[in-house]
C-alpha cells in the first residue's frame, strides 16, 4: 500500500515514523510520503491561502498548490505501480521486492509536472486520472467535519486500496473547486472523525492512517488480535486483565483464572454485550438478531433490550441504572 499525505505542516506527521507503522515502512509493507503544498505555490512567498469570496472569517486554501501537489503524488504513485507490475512479470522471486517500500520513488517538493509519466498519463495528455477505470483510481481522503463518519468498517474498506492520498486542510478548508476537479482524477472521500471541529486535518489523518494501516496484512504481528477488538462484529471489546491476580484489593474475575476455555469465551462475550449496551446502545440497535444466540439475547434482555417482531425495543429503566458493569461472573 502507498500512502501520500498533503499537509502544509509536514512535521505534524512525524509520529507516523514510529512504532508499527514505521516498522511496516522499513519492512516494505507500506510506502509513506508527506508532501507540502507550499512547495507548489507559484509566488515567492509560497502563498497557499486567501480570503473567502462572499466574505466571512478565516482564510481558504487556494486550489492550485493543492492540485499541483496531488498531480505530483499521483505521478509518483502510478510510476511505482507500473514498475512494480513490470518487475513482478519478470520472475516470481521479484514479487517480494516490488512491494511498496521506503526506497521507491515518491513525490518531491517542487516536482509538479516533472518526472517520468506513467503510460496512461502519456495516452491522456498528462492528466493523472484520465483513462483509468474509476475503481482502480487512488482514493483521496479529505478530513472534514462535513464528511461521512470514519468507522472501523470504513477503515477496512480503505485497507483494501493500493493508493491512498490524504489532504490535510487548514483554516476554513480547501477551495471547493479543488475537490470538484479532483473527482475527475481520483475517488474523493470526505471523512469525519466525529461531531467536533479540529484546527486542521493532520490529527484526523494520524488517526485514520493508523486505523487503516494496522489492517494491512503483516503490519500487526498477531492478526488474530484484530478479530477481538472493539467494533469487530458490531460490539465493543471485553475488559482485559494481566498479572498480578490481586492488585490494590481488586481481583481478576474468577472465570478468567479457571482455565475453562468455554466459560472464558462466554464471559468475554457477555462482557462485550453488557459494555456495548451500556456505553453504545446505538450499536445494539444495529445488531442483526440472526447473529445472536439465546445466551446473547438473555444478556441483552437483562440490559433492557428485547426483540419484538424482529425489531429491537429498549425498555426502562436505562441499563446505566442497573448493576455495575462487569458485576456478572460465571465462575
Swiss-Prot record:
<feature type="region of interest" description="Disordered">
    <location>
        <begin position="77"/>
        <end position="137"/>
    </location>
</feature>
<dbReference type="InterPro" id="IPR002649">
    <property type="entry name" value="tRNA_m1G_MeTrfase_TrmD"/>
</dbReference>
<feature type="binding site">
    <location>
        <position position="169"/>
    </location>
    <ligand>
        <name>S-adenosyl-L-methionine</name>
    </ligand>
</feature>
<keyword id="KW-0808">Transferase</keyword>
<comment type="similarity">
    <text>Belongs to the RNA methyltransferase TrmD family.</text>
</comment>
<feature type="binding site">
    <location>
        <begin position="193"/>
        <end position="198"/>
    </location>
    <ligand>
        <name>S-adenosyl-L-methionine</name>
    </ligand>
</feature>
<keyword id="KW-0489">Methyltransferase</keyword>
<protein>
    <recommendedName>
        <fullName>tRNA (guanine-N(1)-)-methyltransferase</fullName>
        <ecNumber>2.1.1.228</ecNumber>
    </recommendedName>
</protein>
<dbReference type="Pfam" id="PF01746">
    <property type="entry name" value="tRNA_m1G_MT"/>
</dbReference>
<keyword id="KW-0963">Cytoplasm</keyword>
<dbReference type="InterPro" id="IPR023148">
    <property type="entry name" value="tRNA_m1G_MeTrfase_C_sf"/>
</dbReference>
<dbReference type="InterPro" id="IPR029028">
    <property type="entry name" value="Alpha/beta_knot_MTases"/>
</dbReference>
<dbReference type="GO" id="GO:0005829">
    <property type="term" value="C:cytosol"/>
</dbReference>
<feature type="compositionally biased region" description="Low complexity">
    <location>
        <begin position="77"/>
        <end position="99"/>
    </location>
</feature>
<comment type="subunit">
    <text>Homodimer.</text>
</comment>
<comment type="function">
    <text>Specifically methylates guanosine-37 in various tRNAs.</text>
</comment>
<feature type="compositionally biased region" description="Low complexity">
    <location>
        <begin position="107"/>
        <end position="134"/>
    </location>
</feature>
<dbReference type="InterPro" id="IPR029026">
    <property type="entry name" value="tRNA_m1G_MTases_N"/>
</dbReference>
<feature type="region of interest" description="Disordered">
    <location>
        <begin position="312"/>
        <end position="331"/>
    </location>
</feature>
<dbReference type="GO" id="GO:0052906">
    <property type="term" value="F:tRNA (guanine(37)-N1)-methyltransferase activity"/>
</dbReference>
<keyword id="KW-0819">tRNA processing</keyword>
<keyword id="KW-0949">S-adenosyl-L-methionine</keyword>
<dbReference type="GO" id="GO:0002939">
    <property type="term" value="P:tRNA N1-guanine methylation"/>
</dbReference>
<dbReference type="InterPro" id="IPR016009">
    <property type="entry name" value="tRNA_MeTrfase_TRMD/TRM10"/>
</dbReference>
Amino acid at each position: 500500500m502507498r500512502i501520500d499525505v498533503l499537509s502544509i505542516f509536514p512535521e505534524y506527521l512525524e509520529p507516523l515514523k514510529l512504532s508499527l507503522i514505521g516498522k511496516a515502512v522499513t519492512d516494505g509493507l507500506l510506502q509513506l510520503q508527506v508532501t507540502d503544498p507550499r512547495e507548489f505555490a507559484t509566488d515567492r512567498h509560497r502563498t497557499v491561502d486567501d480570503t473567502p469570496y462572499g466574505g466571512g472569517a478565516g482564510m481558504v486554501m487556494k486550489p492550485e498548490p493543492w492540485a499541483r501537489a496531488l498531480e505530483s503524488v499521483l505521478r509518483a504513485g502510478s510510476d511505482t505501480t507500473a514498475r512494480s507490475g513490470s518487475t513482478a512479470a519478470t520472475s516470481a522471486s521479484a514479487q517480494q521486492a516490488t512491494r511498496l517500500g521506503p526506497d521507491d520513488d515518491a513525490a518531491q517538493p517542487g516536482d509538479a509536472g516533472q518526472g517520468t509519466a506513467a503510460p496512461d498519463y502519456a495516452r491522456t495528455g498528462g492528466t493523472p486520472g484520465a483513462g483509468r477505470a474509476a475503481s482502480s483510481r487512488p482514493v483521496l481522503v479529505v478530513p472534514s467535519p462535513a464528511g461521512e463518519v470514519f468507522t472501523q468498517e470504513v477503515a477496512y474498506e480503505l485497507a483494501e486500496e493500493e493508493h491512498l492520498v490524504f489532504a490535510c486542510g487548514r483554516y476554513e478548508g480547501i477551495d471547493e473547486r479543488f475537490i470538484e476537479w479532483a473527482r475527475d482524477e481520483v475517488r474523493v472521500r470526505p471523512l469525519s472523525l466525529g461531531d467536533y471541529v479540529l484546527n486542521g486535518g493532520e490529527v484526523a489523518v494520524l488517526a485514520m492512517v493508523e486505523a487503516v494501516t494496522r489492517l494491512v496484512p503483516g503490519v500487526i504481528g498477531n492478526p488474530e488480535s484484530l478479530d477481538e477488538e472493539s467494533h469487530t462484529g458490531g460490539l465493543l471489546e471485553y475488559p482485559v486483565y494481566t498479572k498480578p491476580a490481586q492488585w490494590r484489593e481488586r481481583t481478576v474475575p474468577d472465570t478468567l483464572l479457571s482455565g475453562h476455555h468455554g466459560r472464558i469465551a462466554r464471559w468475554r462475550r457477555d462482557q462485550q454485550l453488557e459494555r456495548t449496551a451500556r456505553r453504545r446502545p446505538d450499536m445494539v440497535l444495529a445488531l442483526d438478531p440472526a447473529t445472536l444466540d439465546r445466551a446473547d439475547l438473555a444478556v441483552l434482555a437483562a440490559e433492557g433490550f428485547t426483540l419484538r417482531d424482529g425489531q429491537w425495543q429498549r425498555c426502562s429503566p436505562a441499563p446505566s441504572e442497573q448493576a455495575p458493569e462487569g458485576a456478572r461472573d460465571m465462575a
